[in-house]
Curated annotation (Swiss-Prot):
It comes from Pyrococcus horikoshii (strain ATCC 700860 / DSM 12428 / JCM 9974 / NBRC 100139 / OT-3). Belongs to the TBP family. This is TATA-box-binding protein. GO terms for biological process: DNA-templated transcription initiation. The keyword NADP does not apply.
C-alpha cells in the first residue's frame, strides 16, 4: 500500500472556462473593469485583473470567459459572481446561471524523499528525462489525465488534473510505480 502521509500538495493555479450565457459589448465591459486591457487588433477579448480574489479573466463578447490564477474553486466562483454583479450594473441580461468548467489545476508538492532521476528515467514507464533540457522527470498519467514533474529533491509539480482528487490519484499512481520498481527505498529506522 502506498503511503502518502508524508506527501504535501498545494494548489498553485486553477484555470476554468466559464459561460455566462449572455452577449457582451466589450466597450461597455471595459468601463466597469478598471484593471483591464483591450486591444481587439491583437486579441479578441478583454484581459481583466481582480485583486480580490486575485485572478485574471479573459472576457469575450460571446459571454465566455477564461479565469486563471485562482487558488481555489471558491476564488473562481467569487470572481464570476463579482463580474456578473458589474455586468448587471450595465444592463446585461443572463439567460441562466453561469457554467464553470475547471480545465486545469496545477499543484506543487513534496514527496519527502530524494530520487536518482537517471534510475527513475531508465526504469519507470511513461516518463521522459532530458537533463540537458529540463532538470526533472516528466511522468505522464493516463487516468486521471495528468503530468507530474519529479525533481531529484522529491519536489513535484502536477498539472492537467481537473480536481484535487485527480491530482492525489495521479500522485498515488506515481508512488505505486516508484514502489513497484524499487525506486523508493524504505526509510532507515532511527536507533
Amino acid at each position: 500500500m502506498v503511503d502518502t502521509s508524508n506527501v504535501k500538495l498545494r494548489i498553485e493555479n486553477i484555470v476554468a472556462s466559464v459561460d455566462l450565457f449572455a452577449q457582451l459589448d466589450l466597450e461597455k465591459v471595459l468601463d466597469i473593469c478598471p484593471n483591464s486591457k483591450y486591444n481587439p487588433e491583437e486579441f479578441p477579448g478583454i484581459i481583466c485583473r481582480f485583486d480580490d480574489p486575485k485572478v485574471a479573466l479573459l472576457i469575450f463578447s460571446s459571454g465566455k470567459l477564461v479565469v486563471t490564477g485562482a487558488k481555489s474553486i471558491q476564488d473562481i466562483e467569487r470572481a464570476v459572481a463579482k463580474l456578473i454583479q458589474k455586468l448587471k450594473g450595465i444592463g446585461v441580461k443572463f439567460k441562466r446561471a453561469p457554467l464553470i468548467d475547471v480545465q486545469n489545476m496545477v499543484f506543487s508538492g513534496d514527496i519527502g524523499r530524494e530520487f536518482n532521476l537517471d534510475n527513475v528515467a531508465l526504469t519507470l514507464p511513461n516518463c521522459e528525462y532530458e537533463p540537458e533540457q529540463f532538470p526533472g522527470v516528466i511522468y505522464r498519467v493516463k487516468e486521471p489525465r495528468a503530468v507530474i514533474l519529479l525533481f531529484s529533491s522529491g519536489k513535484i509539480v502536477c498539472s492537467g488534473a481537473k480536481s484535487e482528487a485527480d491530482a492525489w490519484e495521479a500522485v498515488r499512481k506515481l508512488l505505486r510505480e516508484l514502489e513497484k520498481y524499487g525506486l523508493i527505498e524504505e526509510e532507515e529506522e532511527e536507533l
